[in-house]
């Protein structure tokens, strides 16, 4: 699959045969200007605040410079739990309406799945034999509403034959939340309390990585098959966009595909 440029973070897992997973960094060869500099891949609807033409150009450059096997299946993410199954390759590079979903799965070689984030947790799932992949946008709302479990269930591979990579997200020493987030997890599962540490009355730091590991293991993955974590989008402004840190922020992409 070749060597990737410095503005790409390749998944730190034992890659399944033919599977590639990576996240882009903000300092890639994009055309966006501050505060979206440089490689902002955020929604062309303008949700991220960047000029749509800049996002379009950045997406085109991404495909060309990474030599992707096809145009990525961009999603309209809404912090929901809808899982899109991709059964065909895109027929052209023409812009199409992005389907509303927060996860996607495929077994089609050459189909590029993509998730956009800027603090939420991107998760890549793959069959250990390389036959199937999935990507998930797992913010706290999605995690609480079982988006990971739903994506595992949407895959045709048995959970014990899956592995996962947890991409860059807001870290457990920087992501402070209130009672609403704490209650969304702990009221349903007291074991989730270990992913929260008190900062001040009514506020906690939350460990999205720990919550995701709990959810994935509950869905049937083994602990040793879950990789990644340890990064923090909030505290690393040189590499990552962060909505929590900057408010007006771009989005980076986490992509996965099965080689043709």
From Swiss-Prot:
Purpose: Purine nucleoside enzyme that catalyzes the phosphorolysis of adenosine and inosine nucleosides, yielding D-ribose 1-phosphate and the respective free bases, adenine and hypoxanthine. Also catalyzes the phosphorolysis of S-methyl-5'-thioadenosine into adenine and S-methyl-5-thio-alpha-D-ribose 1-phosphate. Also has adenosine deaminase activity.
Catalytic activity: adenosine + phosphate = alpha-D-ribose 1-phosphate + adenine; S-methyl-5'-thioadenosine + phosphate = 5-(methylsulfanyl)-alpha-D-ribose 1-phosphate + adenine; inosine + phosphate = alpha-D-ribose 1-phosphate + hypoxanthine; adenosine + H2O + H(+) = inosine + NH4(+)
Swiss-Prot/TrEMBL cofactor(s): Cu(2+); Zn(2+)
Entries under SUPFAM superfamilies matching the protein: CNF1/YfiH-like putative cysteine hydrolases
Pfam families (alphabetical): Cu-oxidase_4
Biological source species: Xylella fastidiosa (strain Temecula1 / ATCC 700964)
Binding site for Zn(2+): 79, 120, 137
EC number: 2.4.2.1, 3.5.4.4, 2.4.2.28
Entry's transmembrane regions: none
Protein name: Purine nucleoside phosphorylase PD_1754
Keywords associated with the record: Copper, Hydrolase, Metal-binding, Oxidoreductase, Transferase, Zinc
Signal peptide span: none
Entry GO MF terms: adenosine deaminase activity; copper ion binding; oxidoreductase activity; S-methyl-5-thioadenosine phosphorylase activity
